[in-house]
Amino acid sequence: MDAPVSQYLKSWQFPLTDYPTEKITVRQLLSHTAGMPLGDFTNIYSPGEVMPSNRDVMTDEVVLMREPGTRFSYSNTGYNLLEILIEDVTGQSFSDYIRTEVLLPLGMESAAFDIDEEVTPYPPTGYNLRGKPVPVYLYPSKASGGLFATAHDIALFALSGMKENPVLSGDSIKLLYAPQSNKIGVYGFVFESYGFGHYLEKLPNGMLSVSHGGQGNGIMTHLQAVSETGDAIVILTNSQRSWPFIAYILSDWAQWRGFPSVSMGRIIWGHYGLCVVIGMLVSASILVILRLVSTFYQQKRARFRLIRVSAAFILLGILIWCACQKYLFITSVFPVLSVWLWGTAFVFSIVLLLSVVLPACPRKKDKL
């Protein structure tokens, strides 16, 4: 767990980076504390299409962002490095090894990393953040999100984390759920810490709840479990707009099973909060427009001009920055409301600029 992974890598080596890669360990990779980047999860291919190898992708994407072991930063590339590590240590392909050593022993017989037209049930078409259809696709890397599985398969996986089984011993399960990082950035809004492959939270009744979601182009999934009671829920959706929907389901599930609450339910309050912010921006825009109209014949617009210009350019700068990002957490969580937020913020900034730029029209009596 704590030995440098570079000691075991035979078929791939780290590209040049500003930080010491020889310090990266399996513990850090499993807990997203190795300083590695998120990775490009939009790099997708159709079944049967020629695609680069995981090693080629890793060579392009692995540029350490910070000193290994310093802080949490969710990283798909970290798990894809574990894929290479498993292949180099076992001499098998990652897909074959995981199927033999994990999937089949747990009874996940229909789960697979590869897919063709004969697979049943065939995965449904997904729908992205804009509501456009996304046909079934594959990633060059498997470990971070390349598994095709049914709700029944994932339920069996959830059960494996509740009691000793052919894959995990009791001690391994305890280690799996031991907090590795308590400062988890924006994820701290709904979770307390991160273990190995699971987000962790203490419920109000003192029980430990573990969870993890999955997101890709056109899909959104979530697994939540409470080992002490044997409860778990698996949610698989073919829409990338599903987080608010998932939050409502989890809130209802917790109430049904007698849990006080689960923290993912906070997304519901975030949804309401964004509605309030959008309403405030709309109201502010209307007020500025009304004031602009009412003072059209008055030369009194110099007051707070610098503040209005500054606020407008700050808003526009933020919007431009957001538009340049490949991935935004808020857009992922609130895909519909975020569009309204950007739109109302843009309108408000333009209205502020107009309130400064448009000249006041002198009254007729002033002309005389």
Walk through the language-model features, giving the residues of each.
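Internal amphipathic alpha-helical segments of the cytochrome P450 catalytic fold
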Residues: 2, 6, 95, 154, ...
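Hydrophobic aliphatic residue packing
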Residues: 5, 85-86, 234
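Short, surface-exposed loop or secondary-structure junction motifs
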Residues: 17-217
